[in-house]
């Protein structure tokens, strides 16, 4: 199974919408930049029919160095989480067990 890249997304925009390649690449970059900026501003990103990107604060917790077994603290941090929407879940589940 391969991975969808930003370059492939831009190529699809070029082919499907007739944008030139530079415009298609800029559109993809702008889309992701908008998501990044919203998250930087502590905003939730809701993409209808796809899912939500949220920020979650994780508290400091104890961890362990796997090599030495030494206990070390894992610092508090903020993480981005993604929760798929119902439509996305349904489409993924419809293809469960099929090979591409």
From Swiss-Prot:
Q: Name one Pfam family in it.
A: Bac_DNA_binding
Give GO cellular component annotations, separated by semicolons: cytosol
Please provide the Gene Ontology terms (biological process) for this protein. Answer: DNA recombination; positive regulation of metabolic process; regulation of DNA-templated transcription; regulation of translation
Show the GO MF annotations: DNA binding; structural constituent of chromatin
Superkingdom of source: Bacteria
Leader sequence range is: none
Report keywords, A-Z.
Answer: DNA recombination, DNA-binding, Transcription, Transcription regulation, Translation regulation
Key word Transcription regulation present: yes
Q: Which NCBIfam families match?
A: himA (TIGR00987), PRK00285.1 (NF001401)
Family to which this protein belongs? Belongs to the bacterial histone-like protein family.
Q: What does this protein do?
A: This protein is one of the two subunits of integration host factor, a specific DNA-binding protein that functions in genetic recombination as well as in transcriptional and translational control.
PANTHER family (alphabetical): DNA-BINDING PROTEIN HU (PTHR33175), INTEGRATION HOST FACTOR SUBUNIT ALPHA (PTHR33175:SF2)
According to the record's subunit comment, the protein's assembly and interactions are: Heterodimer of an alpha and a beta chain.
Q: What is this protein called?
A: Integration host factor subunit alpha
Origin species, per record, is Ectopseudomonas mendocina (strain ymp)
């Amino acid at each position: 199974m391969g991975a969808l890249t930003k370059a492939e997304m831009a190529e699809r925009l070029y082919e499907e919408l007739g944008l030139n390649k530079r415009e298609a690449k800029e559109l993809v970059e702008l889309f992701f930049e908008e998501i990044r900026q919203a998250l930087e501003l502590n905003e939730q990103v809701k993409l209808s029919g796809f899912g939500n990107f949220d920020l979650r604060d994780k508290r400091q917790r104890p961890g362990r160095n796997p090599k030495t077994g030494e206990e070390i603290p894992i610092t508090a941090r903020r993480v981005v989480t993604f929760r798929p929407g119902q439509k996305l879940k349904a489409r993924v589940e419809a293809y469960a067990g099929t090979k591409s």
